[in-house]
UniProtKB/Swiss-Prot annotation:
Subunit architecture: Interacts with UBA5. Interacts with UFC1.
Transmembrane intervals: none
Role summary: Ubiquitin-like modifier which can be covalently attached via an isopeptide bond to lysine residues of substrate proteins as a monomer or a lysine-linked polymer. The so-called ufmylation, requires the UFM1-activating E1 enzyme UBA5, the UFM1-conjugating E2 enzyme UFC1, and the UFM1-ligase E3 enzyme UFL1. Ufmylation is involved in various processes, such as ribosome recycling, response to DNA damage, transcription or reticulophagy (also called ER-phagy) induced in response to endoplasmic reticulum stress.
Protein's name according to its UniProt entry: Ubiquitin-fold modifier 1
Originating species: Columba livia
Length: 85
């Protein structure tokens, strides 16, 4: 099985740190989201991954599908601050 590579940028940090992750294309994208969140030390349960265009990605698909639909450049958003007042 071939691998796909994602560059995931943490948008909540002003320095915009990023991690490059390579995973088998059959990997559930929920696992990619969880691993990326753990790498940035943010809670996976309240995080989302979006494209650079701001389009949300449904994690209920394989990493290969996400790569084909959205490419390799993604952003991780911790949702704990979204919508709070």
């Amino acid at each position: 099985m071939s691998k796909v590579t994602f560059k995931v940028t943490l948008t909540s940090d002003p320095r915009l740190p990023y991690k490059v992750l390579s995973v088998p294309e059959g990997t559930p994208f929920t696992a990619v989201l969880k691993f990326a969140a753990e790498e940035f030390k943010v809670p996976a349960a309240t995080s989302a991954i979006i494209t650079n265009d701001g389009i949300g990605i449904n994690p209920a698909q394989t990493a290969g599908n996400v790569f084909l639909k959205h490419g390799s450049d993604l952003r991780l958003i911790p949702r704990d601050r979204v919508g709070s007042s």
